[in-house]
Regions:
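Bacterial Sec-dependent N-terminal signal peptides
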Residues: 1-25
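Lipid interaction determinants
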Residues: 20-103, 108, 116, 124, ...
C-alpha cells in the first residue's frame, strides 16, 4: 500500500512539473511568435517595468553556432565563466534589477552595489537597444546591445568586448573573462550579458 501511495505521489509531482515546463515552453513559443509577427514591437512594449537579475545571458545570432552540436555545451561553459566574473563585481541572482521607464525612455540598473541610469533607444525590427549612460562615477557612454523577451524572461546582451568594459568598470577583473572570450573569439555575432525575469 505504501509503495502504491509513494508511486502515485511521485507521478503526480512529476506530472505537475512536466505540465509547468510545457506551460512555460508554450508561453515562450507564443511570445516569440507574436514578437516575430509584430516585427519586434511586442518586445518594445514588454520591456517596460522592473526586471530581476537571474544570471548571465548568452545569445548566438546567425547559423554558425546553431548548426553545431556543441553549441549548448559552449553556452554552458560561457555562462559558468560569466557567473564567476559577475560574482567578482558583486552581480548575483537576486542582487540586481533593471527598470525600463514606460513614458520617458529612462532606465535604472542596480547590479550588485552599483546603480547606473540613463536613457535608452529600442529599434524593434533589429532588437537593438542602445543604453546611453548618464555621466557619473562610471563614464560608460553609449552601449549598443540586443533585448529579447521570451515568456517572462528578458535577455539583455552586448558584444563581448563592450560587456568586458562595463563589468570591468563595475569592479571585476578582466582575467575572469579570458576563458569566455577565448571560447567565443572564433564565432561571429555572439552576445553576452544578463538574464532577467519579472
Amino acid at each position: 500500500m505504501k509503495k502504491i501511495l509513494f508511486t502515485t505521489v511521485v507521478l503526480l509531482v512529476a506530472a505537475s512539473a512536466a505540465a509547468q515546463d510545457w506551460k512555460d515552453a508554450l508561453k515562450k513559443i507564443a511570445t516569440t511568435a507574436v514578437d516575430e509577427v509584430t516585427d519586434g514591437k511586442l518586445t518594445r512594449y514588454a520591456l517596460d517595468g522592473t526586471w530581476n537579475y537571474t544570471g548571465p545571458g548568452v545569445k548566438f545570432e546567425g547559423g554558425d553556432i546553431a548548426s553545431e552540436v556543441g553549441g549548448a555545451a559552449l553556452e554552458t561553459a560561457v555562462v559558468k565563466q560569466l557567473e564567476k566574473a559577475y560574482a567578482k563585481a558583486g552581480i548575483r541572482p537576486g542582487a540586481g534589477t533593471f527598470t525600463f521607464g514606460k513614458d520617458d525612455d529612462a532606465f535604472t540598473a542596480t547590479l550588485g552595489s552599483h546603480t547606473l541610469s540613463g536613457t535608452y533607444e529600442y529599434d524593434a525590427p533589429t532588437h537593438v537597444v542602445t543604453l546611453h549612460f548618464a555621466k557619473g562615477k562610471l563614464n560608460l557612454g553609449s552601449v549598443p546591445g540586443h533585448a529579447y523577451i521570451s515568456g517572462q524572461e528578458l535577455v539583455l546582451v552586448f558584444p563581448v568586448t563592450r560587456l568586458v568594459e562595463v563589468v570591468t568598470a563595475l569592479g571585476s577583473k578582466v582575467s575572469y573573462f579570458s576563458t569566455a572570450t577565448t571560447l567565443l573569439s572564433k564565432y561571429k555575432n555572439v552576445y553576452v550579458g544578463f538574464a532577467f525575469s519579472k
